[in-house]
Structures are given as C-alpha cells and as structure tokens.
C-alpha cells in the first residue's frame, strides 16, 4: 500500500482522537499536546471518543480542554458497560472530573454513543481530509466498521472510512512481536480493525514512548496540585509508585503518537519499512499466550512503524515544553 505520510503541521487535516482516558494518565498529556499543536498549526479537532465505559473519562476530557483554553469538542463514548472501568482505572479521573468539569458534575455533559459519534463526524467531513489518532483500544472503531447505513449516512461504516479518512496514527503493538495493552485489552476488536481497515496505519509501538518521561514533577506543592487538573492527573496516577524519586512523571506512550501525527518524519522520527501485522502470533518462550502480534515484512503492508532518531531525553524535553505551558 503506497502512501506518503503528510503530517498535520504541513497538511492540517481534521482530527478525531480516540482515547482510553483513565487507565493511564498519559492520555491527559497526549490531549494537552494535541490541543497545543492544533492552536499552533490550525487544524480542527472534530471530536474525542472515549473507548472505555468510564464516564469520569468524559469529564476529564472536558476538564483538560477547558484548562487549556478551548471549547470541548463533540464527545463520544463506548456504549457498553464494564470495559476498563474497574477501580484501577479510576486513579485520577474521578477527582479531576468532579473538581474541574462543571458539566460533568451537574450532568449536562453531552456524550454520543460511539457509532453515532463516528458516523456523524465522518458523514459531515470532507473526503480524504480526516486523520484518526488512537491512543486506546479499538472497540469504537470496530463498531464503526460494522455499522450499517442509517439516517446519518447512506454509507456503511467501511465506506465512510474509505471515503473520508486519509490515514490512522495509533499507539499500539510492539516490535518485533509481543503483547501490548491497547491490543490485548480487546484483542478481537483490534484484530478486526487491523485486518479490515482500508487506509495506512502508522504505529508508535510500546518501545517508542516507554522510556520517554514527561509530566508534572516540577509541581510538588500539594495546594497547586489540587488546583491544577493536569498536575492532579499525573500525581494521582503515580502517587503510589515507589520507583519514582519525584511523583508526577510517566512514560509517553500516547504523546509520541500525537507528536508524530503532527510533526511527521524529520529530526525526531523516521519510518520503518511497511509490514503486515500477524495476530495470534506464537511467542516461543510463552506458548500459553495467544494474544500476541508479530510484524512480518511486507512491501505492500499497510502498517508502518515509527522509529526514534534522537535520545529519549530529547523527546521528553520537547514534550515537557508543551505540557508545562498549561
């Protein structure tokens, strides 16, 4: 699949963000970066869709947008119950949503179901002018692909994607093979999307952002943390960690996907050769695990993984420079 990646800084397409806001705090940092980049380069954020059942994630999205000085865009959420909604997925977003989102507190935050969300935005978008960025699981997109014509659009979900979406950038998978959270948390949805998706998929795999540290460790005053939704997110998420000398920092898994989507190939990142992604890949040392993936070289493959060109510390500094504007 031949495709020339056009970053948002040069071709300001409309963006839809799909996030699992809650299980990890780097979704907060990724959203901050996306908002800041949108201000800089003038591309619209059409909407943000929460792929979990965690309603506090919606309030957190609203809180982050308002803290960063922008109106909260059209919101969507997975309609199912019990997905990524256990206590471990509520370390920070309950507090952030309750404290900083008035609409969440008073029950007026409007959120569409995931199919209505995607079909509405894509039906009204210009052809080939949408970039979808995913920093969570793929259940929302699986639902979109299987959706049928309705009052919103005479096109199927697959036809809408083919017509409206230029490419997808995702934080997912690991090279050369292995298990990664955004895939194994809903393996069948990821498999369906990756096998059926009709556009190129650019991947920031686990190892790209793992050791790139970013966040709010420059804020340690408890009073400031309690008044700052971004610092609260990072500090509440990391406060029980014993391996951090200073709380408030986390890996940048999702932030690197955002950074690549906007900046593209250049000093910081390059692209590897296309591959196919094999599901149900066997890991010799762990034969009991059936939900791994493996990258298989394929010149016609639609999966293109990112590669870092600079040290992790350099990327972390550039991301922190954005986060700490707010």
Describe each model-derived feature in a short phrase.
Residues 76, 169, 259:
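Residues in well-ordered beta-strands of folded domains
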């Amino acid at each position: 699949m031949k495709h020339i990646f056009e970053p948002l800084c040069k071709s300001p397409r409309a963006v839809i963000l799909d996030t699992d806001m809650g299980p990890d705090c780097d979704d907060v940092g990724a959203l901050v970066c996306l908002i800041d980049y949108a201000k800089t380069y003038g591309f619209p954020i059409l909407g943000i869709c929460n792929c979990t059942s965690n309603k506090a994630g919606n309030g957190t999205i609203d809180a982050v947008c308002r803290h960063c000085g922008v109106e909260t865009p059209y919101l969507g959420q997975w309609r199912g119950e019990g997905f990524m909604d256990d206590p471990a997925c509520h370390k920070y977003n309950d507090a952030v949503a309750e404290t900083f989102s008035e609409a969440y507190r008073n029950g007026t935050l409007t959120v569409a179901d995931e199919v209505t969300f995607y079909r509405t935005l894509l039906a009204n978008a210009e052809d080939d002018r949408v970039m979808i960025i995913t920093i969570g699981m793929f259940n929302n997109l699986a639902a979109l692909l299987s959706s049928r014509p309705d009052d919103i659009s005479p096109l199927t979900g697959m036809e809408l994607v083919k017509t409206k979406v230029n490419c997808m950038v995702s934080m997912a998978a690991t090279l050369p093979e292995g298990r990664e959270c955004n895939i194994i948390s809903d393996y069948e949805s990821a498999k369906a999307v990756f096998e059926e998706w009709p556009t190129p998929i650019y991947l920031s795999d686990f190892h790209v952002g793992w050791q790139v540290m970013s966040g709010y460790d420059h804020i340690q005053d408890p009073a400031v943390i309690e008044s700052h939704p971004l610092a609260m997110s990072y500090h509440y998420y990391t406060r029980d960690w014993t391996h951090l000398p200073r709380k408030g920092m986390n890996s940048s898994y999702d932030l690197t996907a955002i950074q690549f989507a906007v900046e593209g190939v250049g000093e910081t990142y390059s692209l590897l050769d296309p591959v196919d992604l094999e599901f149900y890949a066997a890991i010799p040392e762990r034969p009991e695990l059936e939900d791994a993936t493996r990258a298989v070289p394929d010149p016609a493959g639609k999966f293109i993984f990112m590669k870092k060109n600079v040290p992790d510390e350099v990327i972390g500094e550039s991301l922190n420079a954005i986060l700490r504007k707010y």
